[in-house]
Amino acid sequence: MSLEQLAGRLISGDIGATAVIKMTGEIIYQSPNWSVDGVHAINVYKNREPSIIIQGVKYSVIDVNEDRLIATNVGGQGHIVGAVAGGKALLIGYVSPNGDARTAYIQIDKTARQLSKIL
């Protein structure tokens, strides 16, 4: 399965968009309905910054470590969930406001593990 197929397969239910970002900040895939600043996203992850901004929406980081990034918008505009793909890239997804970020993380992490084999 290709990178695009794996990342795109996540888009259903509560996950509305995905992106795969190399640790350099280079975006190697993003769903057509999303515009992500790859360098910013990687800096938030690496530096454990308190917030991430995607498409002008600020999300407060609630959990970040070497394996994951979980952020939520305090105004109820959804969540950002990310999992590391073998230390090579960060797979992030937008989770709808009614979605459960921790449940989405399980799906995203599983896909990130598959991505690590093809990156």
Swiss-Prot record:
<protein>
    <recommendedName>
        <fullName>Odin profilin</fullName>
    </recommendedName>
</protein>
<comment type="similarity">
    <text>Belongs to the Asgard profilin family.</text>
</comment>
<dbReference type="InterPro" id="IPR036140">
    <property type="entry name" value="PFN_sf"/>
</dbReference>
<dbReference type="GO" id="GO:0003779">
    <property type="term" value="F:actin binding"/>
</dbReference>
<keyword id="KW-0009">Actin-binding</keyword>
<dbReference type="GO" id="GO:0005856">
    <property type="term" value="C:cytoskeleton"/>
</dbReference>
<keyword id="KW-0206">Cytoskeleton</keyword>
<dbReference type="GO" id="GO:0005737">
    <property type="term" value="C:cytoplasm"/>
</dbReference>
<keyword id="KW-0963">Cytoplasm</keyword>
<comment type="function">
    <text>Binds to actin and affects the structure of the cytoskeleton. At high concentrations inhibits spontaneous rabbit actin nucleation. This strongly suggests this archaea has a profilin-regulated actin system, and actin-type genes can be identified in this organism.</text>
</comment>
